[in-house]
Amino acid sequence: IMPSLVGSEMCIRDRRYGVPGPIVVAIWGRESAFGSASIPHDAFEVLATKAYLARRKDMFRAELIAALQIVQDGDLSVRDMKSSWAGALGQPQFMPTKFRALAVDFDGDGRRDIWNSVPDTLASIAHYLQQSGWVAGRDWGFEANVPDAVSCTLEGPDQGRPIRDFISAGVTRVSGRPFPPHEASATGHLMMPAGRMGPAFIATPNFYVIKQYNNSDLYALFIGHVADRMQGGGAFRGGWVKVDGVSRGDVARMQQRLQAMGRDVGGADGLPGFKTRRSIGAFEAENGLRVDCWPTAELKKHLN
């Protein structure tokens, strides 16, 4: 991936946008395998079809209009407007409205070419994160040891607190290193993507900025972890416990039961997001069960 080119340009981008180069490169790698992935579809065919047939017709109609405006602006020809099956454009996989708002002509050739230009691609990703609220100088998060005394029900982006409060409660970094002083005095969030059945993290607001690129805890973890590995970090220390006997339909039914009790699970979609996880934990605590904050076969019995 042309390490000397990428490395020098990342230094420039770090200064201009305040987003660490490894985070940008990790997103580039995840979205298009560093520009090597095939992006074969005609963007106009994809977007027009979805504007007519998809569930979110209004959204795709707006994206189709934005795609037409991209050609009108002179960034690309109609023939070269290639997208994914979902209408996402180029190496960073921007939807057309995001392209118009956030794509950057970093190489100075007069076009924002996120299909063929590595400088434009990387700068556009950095600009996207900057405009989404990236806090310069802060990390994305830290894998942590979270003692049982710190409840998994404290998870979520709406329950942030100074990281020093977590430290006082016994939370430590799995690396054995202390939290940097500037991080300890700033806001952090408990993040346990599999409840007590997987690794735990103290996430910073930048973790949730990554989620604005793709609204998935596991996506943001992937990006942060790959960026750390680029800088010499090791594998996650916490293991992921395999949970048998629970299907997505089972999770949806559990969510429905919890909703009927007046708990906010974030929607009964069968996906255990943070609201579902902490609602499960609260139910477990109130009913004398082991507090795992995760949909298990044992919990399924109690909610039937």
Regions found by a protein language model. Give the residues of each.
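Single conserved hydrophobic/aromatic residue that forms the stacking wall/gate
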Residues: I1-G7, I12
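Surface-exposed patches in mature extracellular/periplasmic domains of secreted proteins
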Residues: R15, P20-A26, V78-S83, D109-D113, ...
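Short, functionally critical alpha-helical segments immediately adjacent to catalytic or ligand/cofactor-binding
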Residues: V19-G35, A67-I70, I125-H127, T296
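Secretory-pathway/luminal and periplasmic proteins that interact with or process carbohydrate-rich
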Residues: S32-H41, L53-K57, D73-R79, Q93, ...
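Acidic, His- and aromatic-enriched active-site or binding-groove loops in soluble protein domains
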Residues: F44-V71, D105-G110
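Flexible, glycine-rich surface segments
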Residues: V78, W85-G90, M95-Q212, A220, ...
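Acidic, Ser/Thr/Pro/Gly-enriched interdomain connector segments
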Residues: T204-D217, H225-G270
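Short acidic, glycine/serine/threonine-rich helix-capping segments at coil-helix boundaries
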Residues: V246-V251, Q259-L303
